[in-house]
Amino acid sequence: MESSISQTLSKLSDPTTSLVIVVSLFIFISFITRRRRPPYPPGPRGWPIIGNMLMMDQLTHRGLANLAKKYGGLCHLRMGFLHMYAVSSPEVARQVLQVQDSVFSNRPATIAISYLTYDRADMAFAHYGPFWRQMRKVCVMKVFSRKRAESWASVRDEVDKMVRSVSCNVGKPINVGEQIFALTRNITYRAAFGSACEKGQDEFIRILQEFSKLFGAFNVADFIPYFGWIDPQGINKRLVKARNDLDGFIDDIIDEHMKKKENQNAVDDGDVVDTDMVDDLLAFYSEEAKLVSETADLQNSIKLTRDNIKAIIMDVMFGGTETVASAIEWALTELLRSPEDLKRVQQELAEVVGLDRRVEESDIEKLTYLKCTLKETLRMHPPIPLLLHETAEDTSIDGFFIPKKSRVMINAFAIGRDPTSWTDPDTFRPSRFLEPGVPDFKGSNFEFIPFGSGRRSCPGMQLGLYALDLAVAHILHCFTWKLPDGMKPSELDMNDVFGLTAPKATRLFAVPTTRLICAL
């Protein structure tokens, strides 16, 4: 008996035998664990290790909408070691954004996003928690408020500048898309750095474009972390250069603003001084960020570092430039494709405003059909088609398992075109928003969420809508538009390009004719 026991112990001490036992136990425990947890949602079958990475080109708003037709409103994919979920129905969106809002309130971040936002020092990609809550409070009250937006002369000034530019090209085809992008770029740049600041704008736009490319670049290390130290695509070098360029540019601007503030304090004559976004954020500046009680006075409850200020500025530049420009261009494109709706909007402008003056802010709320047109544009072409979230803990939806740190993509594009929520969802029909009970985009109707909903809804919604309303109203009131070279409305290119936003694949060209009898 003792001999048998000693032989058994001798076998167990053998490394190979021990390894087999450990692996067997691991497989057994994994099997038991999997049997106890709910199943994953349906989705396309993946390969070992790489999962569904061969389907990367289908992870667009349109590609995921097509997958939803086969697998339903909650679809599971595995990209390397990362679990990904596509949400394409209002019912599942409600679970994510309302019922389990706290579980899904984190933001996923790629290697590029983490590095370029100074390790999530911004608001857009910071994880949900005390730091994020107070950062959002600062931004909503000081940066993104409607009152603050209306006080920014840059919006009105840049719209006026665009109108004058268009009026110089009456009767000729113009690149409307370029005009609009220049408008939103100038608005956000001046709002961030000062109404008289044009120095280095081209350099900053170059940096912004490189950031955009890096944010959207495929990096295999995001899905298989072991490749991170190899950097087979050379992305790490580009990341370092891009952030160094940004540091050099914005550090100079911050230094200039701090010197200006010191000089103003030294010669305080009581005059009210116009402030920009950098000034607003510098009011909270400290060498080290510090959090106190969330009920404390705002000025004392959070201190921002330079990294925080730079990261927030990049949030605003991305959120306020491409998203608003895309919405304006899509609105004009859809109206040129639907002449009857264009005629109705311009008739309303003539009746409410008159042809003897320009549109003023006080007119906007009276332009009911214009508002319907912009809502329909946001339904069909949401500024950010995929809203990204990350789970803070293991959870389940409709009996399906969603593990911690899963990436959840809420497809605002697919939800806005859900045939169970919208009649003729692929048809541009602004009049649908005149009907009683139609969903609104403020975040409580999950059939229509162009700005998200819940804790992580877009804090810049009011500012974006203000610029959208004002720009489209002026463009349509000041000018009559037609397509160039005898092009028919049905011939307009309605394809988009997927990225952080989904702008038109080709720029809109149109011919303006002066409409007003007053000076432009």
Swiss-Prot record:
Keywords: Acetylation, Heme, Iron, Membrane, Metal-binding, Monooxygenase, Oxidoreductase, Transmembrane, Transmembrane helix. Heme binds at C458. It is a single-pass membrane protein. Pathway: Aromatic compound metabolism; phenylpropanoid biosynthesis. SUPFAM superfamilies: Cytochrome P450 (SSF48264). GO terms for cellular component: endoplasmic reticulum; plasma membrane. Its EC number is 1.14.-.-. Its main location: membrane. It comes from the Eukaryota. GO terms for biological process: lignin biosynthetic process; phenylpropanoid biosynthetic process; response to UV-B. The keyword RNA-binding does not apply. Its cofactor is heme. The modification N-acetylmethionine is found at M1. GO terms for molecular function: heme binding; iron ion binding; monooxygenase activity; oxidoreductase activity, acting on paired donors, with incorporation or reduction of molecular oxygen. Belongs to the cytochrome P450 family. This is Cytochrome P450 84A1. It comes from Arabidopsis thaliana (Mouse-ear cress). The lineage of its organism: Eukaryota, Viridiplantae, Streptophyta, Embryophyta, Tracheophyta.
